[in-house]
Amino acid sequence: PVPITRPMGCSTKWREKQPMAAQVHAAWAAAPVVVERLDAAGLAKLRAAKTDRVRVYNVWATWCPPCVKEFPDLVSISRQFDMRNVDLITLSMDKPADEAKVAAFLTKQQAGVSRRGLSAAKNEGRATNHFLFTGSPDELAAALDPEMLGPIPHTLVVAPNGKILYRHTGIINRLQVVGVILDEINRFYGPKPGK
């Protein structure tokens, strides 16, 4: 028999996928942004929804410099996990009169929801994952995260069963959030203990 050896060298197989990756990025950039208004009752319903998806909730505003600074990382996370049942749900604390400003910011960030994400949203009776919250900060905290103290940005990673896996006020550490998401989704895709 011939011994089995490890292949060594540089893998270039991904080079041939560059045109496909460019198409995917172009589709993301062209995805329309829809912003809906959401009150406390709607947020409570969204938060309590039974789903098979991990959700990253982000409370933010266009007038909040740390929120603006971290947003590209949130978009990156959303794209990274688009095919893995992970949703980015944004909750803007801007005034309702600034809805167009919110939509313009999200469009500039290329934060449109993918077809896969829109399909999941439509299954729950929503048209988007981007919301302008119309209630008070206290109502938002009561509906989303009773431990939220008030400052933004405020980010949660929530398991499909509703358990909060990650809670952070301030600018997120992208790799930390990615690690939390991977720990959760790998429970379903990884090898079973003892095997």
Outline where the language-model segments fall:
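Residue-level recognition of beta-strand->loop/alpha-helix junctions
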Residues: 92-94, 132, 168
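Short pre-active-site segment immediately N-terminal to redox-active cysteine/selenocysteine motifs
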Residues: 53-55, 59-63, 95, 151
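N-terminal targeting signals for export/organelle localization
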Residues: 1-37, 166, 195
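Conserved redox-active cysteine motifs that mediate thiol-disulfide chemistry
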Residues: 59-76
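A short beta-strand-turn-helix
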Residues: 34-55, 78-81
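Short, internal strand/loop/helix patches
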Residues: 106-152
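Thiol-/selenol-based redox modules, centered on thioredoxin-like
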Residues: 9, 150-195
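Loop/turn elements at helix/coil->beta-strand transitions in domains of secreted/extracellular proteins
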Residues: 50-55, 84-87, 113, 125-128, ...
